[in-house]
Amino acid sequence: MANKIGKIIQVMGPVVDVDFEDYLPAINEALEMELEVEDKKIRLVLEVAAHLGDNRVRTIAMDMTDGLVRGMEVKATGDSIKVPVGEEVLGRIFNVIGDTIDEGEPLQAKTYWSIHRSAPPFEEQSTKEEIFETGIKVVDLLAPYKKGGKTGLFGGAGVGKTVIIMELIHNVAYKHSGYSVFAGVGERTREGNDLYYEMKESNVLDKVALCYGQMNEPPGARNRIALTGLTMAEYFRDEMGLDVLMFIDNIFRYAQAGAEMSALLGRIPSAVGYQPTLASEMGRLQERITSTKKGSITSIQAVYVPADDLTDPAPASVFAHLDATTVLNRRIAEKGIYPAVDPLDSTSRMLDPNIVGEEHYKVARGVQAVLQKYKDLQDIIAILGMDELSEEDKLTVERARKIERFLSQPFFVAEVFTGAPGKYVTLEETIEGFKGLLEGKYDDIPEAAFYMVGNIDEALEKAEKLKAK
């Protein structure tokens, strides 16, 4: 039996070199040590990243390396980082090594899985093209999500990314009675904290597992936290045969942390200073997010675009993997239309008559055509006013304004601060409503009736009330 105890020979920030006498730990193997910080015992995990020769390894620390000195003992575990999986993880917050950090009861998990896993083989992958109904009108109609697909959620600060994420978690929990996993990758601690309490208030916490690797943590933790969350989601898919929703906020920070790790390990950087392995790292993560014949993982990934440059290598490496994009627009939020999804910028591979059907496709393209025409006419309206438009254009503008308002909808998770009860709208109801609007069935109804309602029947009810007033 080889001696699995090694000694620290060098510490460079989050990178630690360890020397073993007669044992060589494998790449990605977890090494453990106990540290005393302010009279508290802390389990520090180091992950092997490179072999330096002569039984020496270079490792990345999953926590702060304050207090480490040369000569300290490190124990090899003989395995990679393992995290708890199964229904026990729901409603709890985890760090990268699978320890709970919500100060709750000790975790009673029966099963632990390694965070480094292979993507499912080709023969197990499902090739069905199916829509994932979210209950959010603008998404289901114009840029539908693929079941087991990947969607990028693009938006600046304060346009409602987190609210959409919470609404999706709510709708999955109640309509599909499914589970969700949320991985906060390089998140602000405050946002993670807010999300936890908001979920608690809106009663969705017991259907979701939260994994946080915040901004203040070393790059190892910020990079690997995405794998921790994904492993929990994979268990629900493979062992329980469920359709899981996986949220990653923010996928850019995953690439960013990888770049930091790469530089610390002394690798030569590639374009814009990113790691030379950016595409393969991203591919390894994204290939695990897929549908199998047992279940599916549908992922929604928030994408931060540095300096609004879509050609930056990090966001560009994400684009290749996405099936749909949901773009949030501040101009729409300023009009008071929530969710502030841009109906003309958001795209989906699923919006194809062979997948969604002829009717859905025609209605969606019709809605986009009317909104595009309205956008083109806005300059004329701003300079000359509505009166200068032809009768046909006036009608287009009126319909477009109604469509714009009908694309808004009250959210369940926003009930607390809007006072309006949330609405889940099925795909059939969504198509029926917009089809009627395009055909001119509702031309005599005031546009105020379409604002913040669910299906078309509610808009007609609201119109009756407005008339009565």
From Swiss-Prot:
**CDD domains, alphabetized:** ATP-synt_F1_beta_C, ATP-synt_F1_beta_N, F1-ATPase_beta_CD
Membrane topology reported for the UniProt record: Peripheral membrane protein
EC number(s): the record gives 7.1.2.2
Q: Where does ATP bind?
A: 155-162
Class of the enzyme per the UniProt entry, highest EC level: translocase
* Enzymatic reactions: ATP + H2O + 4 H(+)(in) = ADP + phosphate + 5 H(+)(out)
MF terms in GO: ATP binding; ATP hydrolysis activity; proton-transporting ATP synthase activity, rotational mechanism
Subcellular location(s) of the protein: Cell inner membrane
Q: Which GO terms describe its cellular component?
A: plasma membrane; proton-transporting ATP synthase complex
Key words of the record: ATP synthesis, ATP-binding, Cell inner membrane, Cell membrane, CF(1), Hydrogen ion transport, Ion transport, Membrane, Nucleotide-binding, Translocase, Transport
What does this chain do? Produces ATP from ADP in the presence of a proton gradient across the membrane. The catalytic sites are hosted primarily by the beta subunits.
Name the PANTHER family for this protein: ATP SYNTHASE (PTHR15184), ATP SYNTHASE SUBUNIT BETA, MITOCHONDRIAL (PTHR15184:SF71)
Q: Which family does it belong to?
A: Belongs to the ATPase alpha/beta chains family.
Assembly state and interactors? F-type ATPases have 2 components, CF(1) - the catalytic core - and CF(0) - the membrane proton channel. CF(1) has five subunits: alpha(3), beta(3), gamma(1), delta(1), epsilon(1). CF(0) has three main subunits: a(1), b(2) and c(9-12). The alpha and beta chains form an alternating ring which encloses part of the gamma chain. CF(1) is attached to CF(0) by a central stalk formed by the gamma and epsilon chains, while a peripheral stalk is formed by the delta and b chains.
- UniProt cross-references to NCBIfam families, sorted A to Z: atpD
Descriptive protein name? ATP synthase subunit beta
